[in-house]
């Protein structure tokens, strides 16, 4: 998982898609996995969403990746990842108002650098 997550920016698109498909199949019941796996897989998922939507402009496995992240609890471990996933879904759907609201929430919470980074991706 670590190697896959770190190699996303330089991976061939077909390899990226194939590996993400394997992650989704292997961890389809992520909510039943140990917390360490949940954290790592959810990080890989968010990185995939960023890479797929913002860099590669591909849609393969995006819905499935979002659905997998949403199986996790909205708590201090995964809440931010769920919010970022919502941002990417809003971006995908062209909902600029909701995107701006999420960025405003992040700024209000002191996560200005993250909000600004998302700003550059919209």
Language model region names:
Residues 1-30:
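Hydrophobic, aromatic-enriched interface-forming segments
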Residues 19-122:
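C-terminal regulatory/effector modules of DNA-binding transcriptional regulators
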């Amino acid at each position: 998982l670590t190697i896959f997550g770190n190699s996303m920016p330089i991976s061939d698109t077909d390899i990226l898609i194939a590996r993400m498909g394997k992650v989704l199949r292997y961890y389809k019941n992520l909510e039943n996995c140990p917390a360490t796996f949940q954290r790592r897989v959810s990080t890989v998922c968010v990185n995939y969403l960023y890479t797929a939507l913002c860099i590669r402009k591909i849609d393969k496995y995006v819905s499935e990746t979002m659905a997998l992240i949403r199986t996790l609890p909205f708590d201090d471990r995964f809440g931010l990842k769920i919010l970022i996933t919502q941002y990417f879904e809003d971006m995908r759907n062209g909902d600029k108002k909701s995107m701006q609201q999420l960025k405003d929430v992040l700024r209000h919470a002191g996560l200005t650098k993250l909000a600004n980074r998302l700003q550059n991706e919209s």
